[in-house]
Amino acid sequence: MEVYNTLSRKIEKLEDIVDGKRVKMYVCGITAYDYSHIGHARSAVFFDVFRRYLEYLGYEVVYVQNFTDVDDKIINRAVKEGKTQKEVAEKFIEEYLKDMEALNVKKPTYQPKVTEHIPDIIEFIQNLIEKGYAYVIDGDVYFHVPAFEHYGELSKQSLEELNRHRIEPDERKRDVKDFALWKSAKEADLKAQAVFDSPWGRGRPGWHIECSVMSAKYLGVPFDIHGGGKDLIFPHHENERAQSFARFGVEPVKIWVHNDFIRIKGEKMSKSLGNIVRIRDVLQRYEGEVLRYFLLTAHYRSPLDYTEEALERAKRAYEYLRSALINLDMEIAYLKTFGDRKEGNQVDVEDYIRRFEEAMNRDLHTPDAIAVLHEFAGLINKSLYELSLNQAEELYEAFKRLCGVLGLFEKMERVPALSREDAEKVVERERARKERNFELADAIRDEFAKRGIRLIDTPKGTRWRVE
């Protein structure tokens, strides 16, 4: 399996980097101050697929995604609404978790919150001060960027270029690039009850230190994969790498992986442009798995253009895959109820599995993997009424497993075989239809419907599914 490493700017073989069959993975979560948007959804869904594929390959994945529950934006909203930092953060964490459930994103192994790790953060900062990488000014603690010689390597920017960035201007800092590890309490922090005791006075942690602390606590250093959106490369991940490298003296992360943006009418989605699309709003019009499917239709390192037309195309494509799986399952239930048929032509399931894996091994190329699934669905539809029970089961298990790598159709219930009594009623209904006794045929159909079973008439006889 090959993955693009942002640090090296190269495609690298995962097997050459990961030790054994255990992968440790950290992905930056949301800052919980507002409803989450489809940019958050893209990152969450992609890294969920990354995790699922690693598990498909036989790896045990320890997956950590944090919640930033104390931050300037959270505090500003809390003050504006007359609430505490905790009240604001907990509300939007809860909303985010609802969105993730709708998108069928698996729960991470750990979901730590910043406020639960204040002692760990203080200890980490103290270590950086002792090693000469950080300094204290009037209750604030800053990381001194020039003390870390590898700064800029992740974002591929020189120190001269970085001097031109606006980075927390403060004339007290030793260098314009220095960034906050700990912020002394301000009036807004006190109003929002977002202050914590520390050796440097009451205050709260800076943004970047949080992820260094929590990734090290739950995964150790070094760990295998660090993920996030492309917008986090600088300054967040650059600063995070500097902190962790300075603290532990080793490259903290083996592979840095970043997904690209979602665009609205050719522009990056952002609050400043007023073009934010919230997950919850899309979910009012589309099933969660349709949105999930859409988010996987572009390669993760390419921008994804969001339009209603694109979502409608995704819906139709998703339903094509789903109907193939349902039809196959109905056929399996039919064969179990009314008896097997002789094997038809041999079906090469392994070819589809191989090509799906080739696509995913090629830097998680989900569009190509989806294309293989559509070919597979075409085969299912073409051969549906020629399969033996064994062949149908083999196709079902293979197709369902590959779709599961993308997080699709996992909650779909199997179509049951009918009892002998119900099978006789189906035969009676088919006879009634042939005799044009539609009143009896409809009565039998309605009786099944009352029990949640929908009878479906096909050119090859009656099939059914549970509603």
UniProtKB/Swiss-Prot annotation:
Top EC class, one word: ligase
'HIGH' region, short sequence motif: residues: 30-40
Enzyme Commission code: 6.1.1.16
GO annotation, biological process: cysteinyl-tRNA aminoacylation
Places the protein is found: Cytoplasm
Note on how the cofactor is bound: Binds 1 zinc ion per subunit.
Protein name (Swiss-Prot/TrEMBL): Cysteine--tRNA ligase
Organism of derivation: Archaeoglobus fulgidus (strain ATCC 49558 / DSM 4304 / JCM 9628 / NBRC 100126 / VC-16)
